[in-house]
Amino acid sequence: MTNQLRWLALYKKAIRNYIIKNGKPDLVHVHVPFKAGILGLWIKRNYKIPYLVTEHWGIYNNLIEDNYVSRGIAFKRYTKKIFQQASQFISVSDYLAKGVNRLVGKKEYEVIPNTVNTDLFFYKEKENSSLRFIHVSNMVPLKNAEGILRSFKKFIQQYGNVELIMIGDKGSVIRNYAKSLDFPIGALRFLGEIPYTQVAAEMQKADCLILFSDIENSPCVIGEALCCGLPVITTNIGGIPELVDQSNAIMIEPKDEESLTQAMHEMIEGINKYDRKKIAENAIGKFSYSVIGKQINVVYGEVLASLKQ
């Protein structure tokens, strides 16, 4: 509690100093209601400045352990109040917004997806001819990296010149499990945690992103892969169906390793049907900073206009 109070005091001081120096802003944009929304409430009460809120946090389900329902009374009370007093609610997916409305309370919303740095993630023609799958995540259990490894092991029993790149593991658990599967030399590489720029470079050298999660909201990694022109194999969960379609993805059910192996076969056998340049072009038109920025500016204008009525 002491740390929370210190955090609030520091931010309140910073906000006061900002207003003294620059004057009052017309609008405050809160990202993730708790804890930033507490400051939004304080600013609204003390300075009469309205705020809107964008929610990214995928806790409004019963699949993750640390979900909204499991949280304490204070968390729920403040979250509900933050949404109620917001002048507008933006969600990164329709799936997430419906979860908020189901558990927190009814609130009209706009869907604006997560953005992608298209200066890093863009189409680049592959320099190598070898076929390559790529997986990028923190590899916590809900990402089901072990299921990817088992499915890929079955896949390479029929295909030789195919590689799987795993990016983002923080420890030895997944690597040790991979060793137990006894992959052929050159079939599997772990790159660990690497700089963001290198993630983009590795995607540009790959042929397909694999995401086999048990639960997701609106994963940034899919937008990043699409902006590089990569088709995607992904589970049909959460907000993912809002990001992909048949022109750029194969969707399967979570935990279905047989379907994942089959999707790998389907992807490699039909890889030439995917127009990577068009995938990238469409994705940049959906996720780039400029596109998302324009959508947010429209919402700002609508909120400010409604307050003048």
Regions found by a protein language model. Give the residues of each.
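Carbohydrate-associated surface elements
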Residues: 95, 115
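Conserved donor-binding/catalytic core segment of Leloir-type glycosyltransferases
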Residues: 125-152, 165
